[in-house]
A protein has these predicted regions:
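Pan-zinc metallopeptidase signature
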Residues: 42-59, 63-64, 218-287
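Short alpha-helix carrying the canonical HExxH Zn2+-binding catalytic motif
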Residues: 140-160
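Active-site/pore-lining binding-face segments in mid-to-C-terminal subdomains
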Residues: 184-237
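An active-site-proximal "capping" alpha-helix that borders the catalytic cofactor pocket
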Residues: 168-187
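Bacterial N-terminal signal peptides that target proteins for export
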Residues: 1-8
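C-terminal motif of bacterial Sec signal peptides marking the signal peptidase cleavage site
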Residues: 14-17
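Acidic helix-start/capping segments at beta-turn-to-alpha-helix junctions
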Residues: 94-110, 174-178, 192-212
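A metal-dependent hydrolase signature that marks the N-terminal structural subdomain at the beginning
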Residues: 19-118, 123-133, 274-287
Length: 287
């Protein structure tokens, strides 16, 4: 999935970055800027930065849930797809493992101390069970889509850490923005990729399932580093609608997103998009 999305994203970022560069070439008087282009600085050994790769590693699975989840990852080459997409897009400053592992919990996370992405085997297995309870005829499909969506969220943490990017606000909310930013880039035809939009919407569906299971937020949920799941649902729906109000009008027409929020979503996503183009463009590979 990510190997298909990556070229779309890179094209969109190239167009956006070119537009920003052209705008920056002139100041208010129309004079050309003398600023030098951003390039990768060499390290102490004289080699350019950004030669790292995301490398897939599978660990053993022993529990029923972990064995099932590992099979999902391997049968569909999900971790390989995630790694290939990241390697296509980004000049990583070092090798970064993406590790499939038994965690004995339902999770997926960027491990700051180990500097590796950890995709728990229990995660897709549990999500398949969650979506089966919604009477979805093929619960594996939304389980995989939601797993990709959560990977993009964790990729946001990874990029912030790897490139020491500035973050204003709660990092968990910012990581959700990264997922939306990646998935809502238009192709050369200026249209969003339908499957990518569906991944984001399925991620919102997952947060809605969790919100329903957790019930009314209590003090601990409001104090948590994550926004309450229901808030995250509305954020993702807002950004999907804001990226393409006409193409994603059903989000509002079906009453999934309040009109009072929807009217501001186009500007909201535009701000997010421009911010992440600015932050990530220096670290993108040139193809």
């Amino acid at each position: 999935m990510l190997t298909r999305v990556a070229p779309i994203m890179l094209t969109a970022l190239f167009i956006a970055a070119c537009g920003s560069s052209q705008h920056a070439q002139t100041d208010s008087t129309g004079a050309e800027s003398s600023a030098a282009p951003i390039t990768s600085a060499p390290n102490e050994g004289g080699e350019p930065e950004g030669t790292g790769q995301m490398i897939v590693r599978y660990e053993d699975a022993t529990s029923k849930e972990a064995i099932s989840g590992k099979k999902i990852y391997q049968d569909h080459k999900m971790l390989e797809d995630m790694a290939d997409g990241v390697n296509y897009l980004f000049d990583l400053p070092q090798d970064i493992p993406i590790v499939g592992k038994q965690c004995d919990q339902v999770n997926a996370f960027w491990n700051t101390e180990e500097r590796q992405m950890e995709m728990c085997y229990e995660f897709p297995d549990d999500l398949r069970s969650e979506f089966a309870q919604t009477d979805d005829p093929d619960p594996l499909k939304p389980a995989m889509d939601a797993t990709y969506g959560v990977f993009f969220h964790e990729m946001g943490h990874m990029l912030i850490d790897a490139y020491d990017l500035p973050v204003t606000g709660r990092e968990e909310d910012v990581a959700d923005q990264v997922a939306a930013f990646v998935l809502l880039q238009p192709g050369e035809d200026e249209q969003l990729d339908g499957e990518s939009v569906q991944v984001l919407l399925t991620m919102a569906d997952l947060f809605q399932i969790w919100a329903n299971e957790n019930g009314q937020p209590d003090e601990s949920m409001f104090a948590d580093e994550h926004s309450p799941d229901q808030v995250r649902v509305y954020n993702l729906l807002c950004w999907a609608f804001g990226a393409d109000p006409e193409g994603n009008s059903e989000i509002v027409d079906a009453g999934l997103l309040p009109e009072a929020r929807a009217v501001r979503c186009e500007d909201e996503f535009d701000h997010i998009n421009r911010a992440w183009v600015t932050l990530l463009e220096p670290h993108m590979k040139q193809h």
